[in-house]
Amino acid sequence: MAFTLQIRQKKLFGKTTLDIPSLAQACGFCYGSNNDFYILQENEQVGGTAVFYHPEHIGRGIFFDGSKSREGYYEISYNIPTTKSEITDFARLAGEIESCLGRAEMYCVEEERAFTGRELEQGIEDFAAFSRKSLNQFCQNKEFRSHILTLARWPYTLTEDKTTAWGTCTDLFDFERTLHGLQARDVYYAKPRLLQKNDTKEIGAFYALTEECESVFPVRADGFLNLSELKVTEGFVQFVLYSEQRALEGMFPYGQFIEELSGYDVRQFDADHILIPPMTKAELVKLAGKLRGGEGMIQS
């Protein structure tokens, strides 16, 4: 579910072209573009589209589509549920675009009505209340095997305690605090490299863990956001030493890798991911040695 605003410049000639970096700077936003796993690639844009977020209160991201800017047409949207701060940011972005374009009309696709910038600002409390109700309904839905939200920087799988708490919450304070806290960390959010065998067509997921870098890894090799429903049959991990510009010998079975991490102060990140503390070269070499003694290793 989303709130989508179509913005059209009214003047017939000399359409104003807005660029993503300038809009981000004017509103105090950061921006990037999602990869295939809904992990944000910072400071990138694709075909005039990007995801905006405010670094001081990171939510689910505001999608901007300026692919038809030469026609004086733009679209911005936010996902529901989202945080009150992000709704405020959305209204600010709409106001900035309206100001840059001069005379413009704004139309909400979902509500099938026009809005002015002032109406958006005045409606923030109502929009936030609807978002909170949507969060309640989302968390109360027992048909979901898991509750996953795409956030501004990466996906988030709700833990059982958050699902329970947000199913009956009366405000968005903890929701906003949690989403920002998860995304404000300076971490590497692991993404797999998917390879398919020519003979069996089986798909393998390959991950890389680097030294001295706090990292978020899925508990299972297939634990990435997979809207294409690809069937991953096996997973492997490789250790990379950036300081020496080389990888340690071997690729190790993913399940064994996760089991061996139990002694390294690993913590839960969300229901499907763990937070691995920065590991030194010596620790990676030692871990590789343990895994090298197990079965199923493949040579790199």
Features from the language model and the residues they span:
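Short, extreme N-terminal segment that most often corresponds to the first beta-strand
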Residues: 1-45, 140-164, 292-300
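Secondary-structure junction/capping motif
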Residues: 16-22, 116, 243, 253
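Short, intrinsically disordered low-complexity segments
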Residues: 22-80, 84, 225-233, 238, ...
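Charged/polar, solvent-exposed surface patches and flexible loops
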Residues: 25, 92, 96, 286
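Internal, hydrophobic cores of structured domains that mediate oligomerization or house catalytic pockets
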Residues: 35-36, 41-43, 65-168
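Aromatic/basic-lined ligand-recognition segments
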Residues: 120-239
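Extended, charged low-complexity segments
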Residues: 230-300
